[in-house]
Amino acid sequence: MASAELRIINRRIKSVKSTKKITRAMELIASSRIVKAQQRLTSSNNYTNLLTQIVEELTGSGEMPTSPAIEGTKKITLVVITSDRGLAGAYNTNILKLAEIRKGEYENLGNQVEIVTVGKKANGYFKYRNVEPKQNYEGITDEPNFENALQIMTPLVEEFYEGKTNQIELVYTEYQSAMTQTALYKTVLPFEVEQIAKEIESVGGYTFEPSASQVLSNIIPKYTNATIFSALLNASTSEHAARMRAMKAATENAEELIKILSRQSNQARQAEITTEISEIVGGAEALAG
């Protein structure tokens, strides 16, 4: 009996050690990827912040982009950015919860909401709930590039100016540090002056030629593309950070479980030895008697 128990425990130890090797490897991979992702995010933020300064000045001049008026229901497009893969803790769960909240809030006001998903997790989530995304993009979130941003945003901006949608909103995870990432939403179009003002203090002193309106029409595509690209980079960096933490926690849990199972193995081995000694002593006494 003790021998059978010992074999079971040892098999579990072997299995947990194998799992630990995998989680440790995934932790190291995520750790290496996050460094590169942070560098790309920092570079992107410099460009995005400059565009934000200019847009703030333009919107402050009274020039605001608008969607053609639509009678009746207002149309909202939510761009939900998740990952293609799991094993990233609550990363995807937090985003999808927020997306559901935003969708519900808009629908409760009588608006029509369309979903654009980035990442397999978002696509699978909404399809499972009988919500067919208008468009789905996969294979982007690991290492997004500017072409991905153009691919996502260009048709949406066209729809905005054609009156097919009145508002474009991103739902994604903002990277703050390796330990802190926050799920949030951000309106891309129409511009929200207060939101832009909070993001960065206006430097002032711009003179627009030939007019603020013409400059704005030229800069809107750059601004919207930079905004979605920044969101993709934030999401990617946050995903790597979340996966690194999740795999680190899994590795530590595996180490703790191995310690517990090793103690159980030692106890089972001691019990087996004690039983064998008792059987030998008992047999010797029987022969002597």
Located regions from the model:
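C-terminal beta-strand-loop-alpha-helix "lid" module of Rossmann-like NAD(P)-dependent dehydrogenases
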Residues: 1-289
